[in-house]
Amino acid sequence: VNNNDKEQTAVQYCEKHYPAMMDEYKKLMWEQYETFCKKQRNYGPTNISVGTSLETPDDIKLSLTGLWFRINDKVQRLKQLVVLGQPGEVGESVQDTFQDLSVYALIAQIVQNGKWGKK
């Protein structure tokens, strides 16, 4: 890393040195955001809040536990597809599974930060 690179932000550095990778990252993040918004429009926030207001530590723990189960389901799915090389019968691709994992991880952070379902 030269001195000019050290003066750049991490974003500037990555966009300069890895433009194709950064463009792909932003494209995937946008696709995930659009999918997230469509699902929110269809289901609303109660599927994650599990019928609670997410105001107590127990409410948040319940929601995060539910998300843990969903994430674990996806990890098990990846194990079948990638590690064991067994195609599934439900037609969920590796790409779809990675996308779901990414979105669930972000949802968990939103819940933990106290912003889930807030206007």
Pin down the residues of each PLM region.
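Intrinsically disordered, low-complexity regulatory regions
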Residues: 1-119
